Amino acid sequence: MYTAFLSCNLGKSHWLQPAKWMYYHLLDGDWGSNALSWQWVVGSFSHKKYIANQENINYYTNHKQSNTFLDVDYEKLALLETPPQLKEIENLKLTTQLPITNEINIDPNLPVLIYNYYNLSPTWRAEMKANRILLIEPDIFKAYPVSDQCISFMMKLSKNIDGIQVFVGNFLELKTKLSGQTIYFMEHPLNSHYEGIEDEREWIIPDAVNIKGSYFSFWKKNEQYIKGRFELKGDQC
């Protein structure tokens, strides 16, 4: 929130480029939640922009900085001109270096489980005997680029899945290498072009439908349920 405030509300950058920059470096990045968070800060949905002065930042980050351009009260901060330190805006050129992989070896007698950047769960259909493929689609990473560190993190996480093989290419290219086996994959907005049996994601609040109002009203309505579901008990603590 602080970064978005400085980049957009004070630095006068459009939210999209710095949001892409942040997503590029997030190991656990999710473009949807990241982009919406930046839009919330800049007031895209309410015309109310988020701002934070030095006192606020010191309090929530346990720092004691002073004499900065943010070291003013909120009335002055709301009228503050863009400081020289934030006036230069970079034209981002973000690219992703995808891994070099070996030819995959498919057992034609077994179904295929497709994993990707957004699903690397080692418990998903863990009991099933299957070909397990990590599908890395260049078009996805061209549209939503990530850093070398993110790709490395993905590859390390994939090692938790026994027998997984890596395929760099699009879904239809992978399909041509199969022999008509049943394909399974997890639901995700970027998987709409997949073909096969789709497993629905686990939802924090499964029966949440027709959501209306603000985030905070939704949170208040479901706060106790969420806390109860994720409460650690006994030897989990």
What label would you give each PLM region?
Residues 172, 184-186, 198-199, 203-205, ...:
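Non-catalytic terminal regions of proteins
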Residues 178-195:
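Acidic beta-strand-to-loop metal/phosphate-binding motif
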